[in-house]
Curated annotation (Swiss-Prot):
Family: In the N-terminal section; belongs to the CopC family. In the C-terminal section; belongs to the CopD family.
Membrane topology: Multi-pass membrane protein
Keyword Manganese: no
Cellular component per GO, a single term: plasma membrane
PANTHER family: INNER MEMBRANE PROTEIN YEBZ (PTHR34820:SF4)
Null allele phenotype: Cells lacking this gene show a growth-defective phenotype under copper deprivation as well as a reduced intracellular content of copper.
Originating species: Bacillus subtilis (strain 168)
Signal sequence range: 1-25
Protein name: Copper transport protein CutJ
């Protein structure tokens, strides 16, 4: 028994120990470009996305003005760069207006599609603008996730209720516990079962008939990351369902020995779920997945714990002596407080990765849903704080009504989370040139500009001026050392020398900034009187 207890304590420690959508895929650039007028026929259409796209359900179909296909019907994703999708065109295409219809499944498992119009020769008519399909809410996905999140919270809340918070014995409580556990397992299985056809329908872009076509289901399962993760989730669910049978049959709800294996499978399910959301494709992928895992775990424990207090203690609150109910709430309070802290920490960190501007927060459906969820979270937090304060002074009156209110808000939070995780997260703000000035000794200053400040070729320009703003002319040499920072940063540094454009102004083009993220640029200069300039700039793109 002691050995099993240590195993469960170690498991919980690993869950709560912080370790080290952004959006659906969108086009970074394409060739031909949107609304471009080409002088001659291109050999192929190439589309580059901001993130890798899946092997399944991808295509580029190119049509002329008569609606005839003019591509070779063989769309490929580059083996050395899964961001790029190409299709070759038929030879010697005549002057005409064309449209390239594309479809792909982004790394976070969401299908995206659109149209790129272009012409060979002058376009007589107007172009239709590029559109991105499936950017609205998918009701099926949202409903499925609402069922999933509710089932997860009910299960873990009920299990932890008996393992850690409740110390009484009641035959009626045993019956209610069995019903809740059985119902939550059934709901969890239903959510996972529905997830496959819902995802297949979204990937195929058709009606519900396509959701059950064997070919499409096979493509979802074996040619998308979401399908592989679904197989893992299904296996973990079967193991979870089988492992809880002994505990339910023997009514061993407070035995660590009976619940060690089910909890391992349960938290494995949560971890697998974290691999399918927006957090799985943020730049700091490891951090995003772990924060999503901690966020979902903590929310499940908090909301599920409140649900257990409402559903399992309903009769205890009606008793003249409410000591047992109050003691249970008192034991739950530090768990709730810890869960709230983890929710805040993980939510803010992942929000930083996904919401890159205030405009995205207030003027996109994703940001607005996140604000609604945050508002509900605050209401729930206020009620939780009231309950925490009440536990410090045990009262004769119960708190069943306010617990029900907190649980109702918690369910609303889970539903809102299901909605906004089904929405496309905001695209990155358009890159802006970097410009920063820093002071050095003797009243001089160093100004660095980087344009266009995005992965690829950038123009680096550096100016050294005196206290009057005039160029310092005795600079002999300027070198820049560029390297990426952060958890995914590389120790490899790129050093290059800027060429003197005019006195005090040094410039050069360079490909050192080859991906998005946080970068440091170390400036080293040497003056004519052998003094050194050493200063560091930090930028994000």
């Amino acid at each position: 028994m002691k050995r099993n207890r240590w195993w469960i304590i170690l498991l919980l420690f690993l869950v709560f120990l912080p370790k080290t959508s952004f959006a659906h895929a969108y086009i970074v650039k394409s060739s031909p470009g949107e609304n471009s007028e080409l002088k001659s026929a291109p050999a192929q259409v190439e589309i580059e996305f901001n993130e890798p796209v899946e092997e399944g359900f991808h295509y580029i179909k190119v049509y002329n003005s008569n609606g005839d296909r003019v591509d070779t019907d063989k769309t490929e994703i580059k083996k050395d760069n899964h961001h790029i999708m190409t299709v070759k065109l038929k030879k010697n295409l005549p002057k005409d207006v064309y449209r390239a219809e594309w479809n792909a499944v982004s790394a976070d498992g969401h299908p995206v599609s659109g149209v790129i119009p272009f012409s060979i020769g002058k376009a007589d008519g107007g172009f239709s603008s590029q559109k991105a399909a499936d950017s609205a809410l998918n009701p099926g996905t949202a409903a499925d996730r609402a069922i999933l999140y509710t089932a997860l919270s009910l299960f873990i809340g009920t299990v932890f209720f008996h393992l850690f918070w409740y110390k009484g014995k009641s035959e009626q409580l045993v019956k209610r516990t069995r019903r809740i556990l059985t119902g939550s397992i059934a709901a969890l299985g239903l959510a996972l079962l529905l997830q496959l056809p819902i995802q297949t329908k979204a990937n195929a872009g058709g009606g519900w008939g396509s959701a059950f076509q064997p070919g499409y289901i096979r493509e979802t399962l074996f040619e998308t990351a979401g399908g592989s993760i679904w197989i893992i989730q299904a296996a973990l669910f079967v193991l979870l369902a089988l492992s809880v049978i002994p505990a339910i049959r023997k009514n061993r709800f407070s035995s660590f020995g009976y619940w060690t294996a089910p909890l391992i499978f349960f938290f494995g399910l949560l971890l697998a779920k974290a691999f399918t959301g927006h957090a799985a494709v943020v730049e700091e992928k490891t951090v995003g997945i772990l924060m999503d895992f901690l966020h979902l775990t903590s929310a499940s424990i908090w909301v599920g714990g409140i649900a257990a207090l409402v559903l399992l203690l309903s009769k205890e609150w009606r008793q003249p002596d409410k000591t047992l109910a109050w003691e249970t709430v008192r034991r739950f309070s530090p768990w709730a407080l810890t869960a709230v802290g983890v929710i805040l920490f993980s939510g803010l960190l992942n929000g930083f990765f996904i919401i890159r501007s205030m405009d995205s927060l207030f003027h996109t459906a994703y940001g607005q849903a996140l604000l609604v969820k945050s508002g509900l979270f605050v209401f729930m937090l206020v009620l939780g704080a009231i309950h925490f304060l009440l536990t410090r002074k045990q009262r004769r009156t119960g708190i069943s009504r306010t617990l029900k209110a907190e649980w109702a808000i918690g369910i609303a939070v889970l539903i809102t989370a299901a909605v906004f995780t089904s929405l496309p997260s905001p695209p990155e703000p358009a890159p802006e040139p970097f410009y920063q000035t820093k002071a050095i000794e003797n009243g001089q200053s160093v100004s660095l500009s980087i344009s266009p400040n995005q992965p690829g070729k950038n123009v680096f320009e550096l100016r050294v001026t005196d206290h009057n703003g005039d160029p310092v002319k005795n600079i002999q040499q300027i070198t820049l050392t560029v390297y990426k920072t952060g958890l995914s940063g590389s120790e490899n540094k790129s050093t290059f020398t800027l060429k003197e454009k005019t006195k005090g102004v040094f410039q050069d083009q360079n490909l050192s900034i080859n991906e998005k993220g946080n970068w440091k640029i170390k400036v080293h200069g040497l003056t004519g009187d052998f003094n050194e300039i050493n200063i560091m700039f930090t930028k994000t793109n």
